[in-house]
Design a protein with these regions (language model features):
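HhH-family (HhH-GPD) DNA N-glycosylase catalytic core used in base-excision repair
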Residues: 1-190
Length: 190
């Protein structure tokens, strides 16, 4: 259920009207198709850290994650060794879950392998829908997220269950899911 916000717009029920960062994310980022591998990698790292937590918690720490993970530079993250992992575990600005931190490095390496195979991670991701945006709402997983999750796990990625991947696909605009009544519900994206 949407409520009227102070700016007169209705938004998805999950958007927190008291968090400006969250409002900007909802209005300007969530559901916008992404074809840039740097942005796709950043969102994959953040979505994996979200597993079991609220997205708002991760979003509030986004800048700290960006600093801690070298601007989400793929090659830098791929090169992380034990010293860097230990430093990340001690970083109070991020979620200090050792398994998720290790997964970020493992996933970076798998991401790079996928780039080599498909020319880009975007090429890999968008091939699942033949480059088209999927319009659906009210779900936490789908047959599409099931297939992509299974494939990413087969490639060695961690924290990429179907619910995480569904949220990722929504975040990067492969799946467009603004709630009924949201001012962005009927926006056509390309």
């Amino acid at each position: 259920m949407q409520m009227e916000w102070s700016d007169g717009k209705k938004r998805c029920c999950w958007a927190n009207p008291k968090n400006e960062r969250y409002i900007r994310y909802h209005d300007e980022e969530w559901g916008v198709p992404v074809h840039d591998d740097g942005k796709l990698f950043e969102m994959l790292v953040l979505e994996c850290f979200q597993a079991g937590l609220s997205w708002e918690c991760v979003l509030n720490k986004r800048e700290a994650f960006r600093a801690a993970f070298d601007g989400f530079d793929l090659e830098a993250v791929c090169a992380y060794g034990e010293d860097k992992l230990e430093a990340l575990v001690r970083d109070p600005g991020i979620i200090r879950n050792r398994l998720k931190i290790q997964a970020a490095v493992t996933n970076a390496r798998a991401f790079r392998e996928i780039q080599g195979e498909y020319g880009s991670f975007a090429g890999y991701l968008w091939h699942w829908t033949e480059g088209k945006v999927v319009y659906e709402s009210g779900l936490t997983h789908s047959e599409l997220s099931d297939r992509i999750s299974k494939d990413l796990k087969k490639r060695g990625m961690k924290f990429v269950g179907t619910t995480v991947i569904y949220a990722y696909l929504q975040a990067v605009g492969v799946i467009y899911s603004h709630d009924g009544g949201c001012f962005l519900e009927h926006k056509t994206v390309v």
